[in-house]
Amino acid sequence: RLESTMRRTLLMPFQEILIAGRDFEFLQGRRWALKELQQYPLICLGSETMTYAFYNQFYLSNNLVLQPDTEAATTDQVVPLVKSGLGLGYVPQNFAKDALAAGDVFTIQLKEEIPTRHVVLVQDGGRVPNAAAREFARMLNSSVTQQNAP
């Protein structure tokens, strides 16, 4: 929850996918329930991240407990860990694009739908932003506008 003076602006949606490396090719070709996949090692971001909180809630909403075997410090570490065969991992679709195209990883089809997430700009309306903060917000909004242009 945000303080009453805080403003949030949805910048762009993104979809995450569950990926696996070649060691888990036997998981291709069908849809899996989360419960069925709990026997396989899971790579997730650390418990102090919003991504962990998001997946913790996702698992709880499906009557499961999130129990990662490996915690990565950043999202860009998940794809190499998955490629190395250390487990399955959730990443934004665009993070896995190159590894998917190269055949190093594949998408695991889930029966449950992973909710869409959003990149959000949060600003304190009770404070006047300095020049750097104003420019950063302008650049973010401009970048998103350009990406969403036809």
Model-derived features: positions:
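Short secondary-structure boundary segments
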Residues: 1, 22-23, 48, 93-95, ...
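Acidic, Gly/Pro-rich loop/turn segments at junctions of secondary structure
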Residues: 1-40, 47, 114
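Alpha-helical segments flanking ligand/cofactor-binding loops in enzyme cores
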Residues: 9, 35, 79-80, 97, ...
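Generic preference for hydrophobic
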Residues: 18-19, 42, 107, 121
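Thr-Gly-centered strand-to-loop micro-motif
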Residues: 21, 45-46, 68, 91
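Secondary-structure junction motif
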Residues: 26, 41-62, 129-131, 137, ...
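Hydrophobic hinge/microswitch elements
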Residues: 53-108
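A late-sequence structural motif
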Residues: 108-149
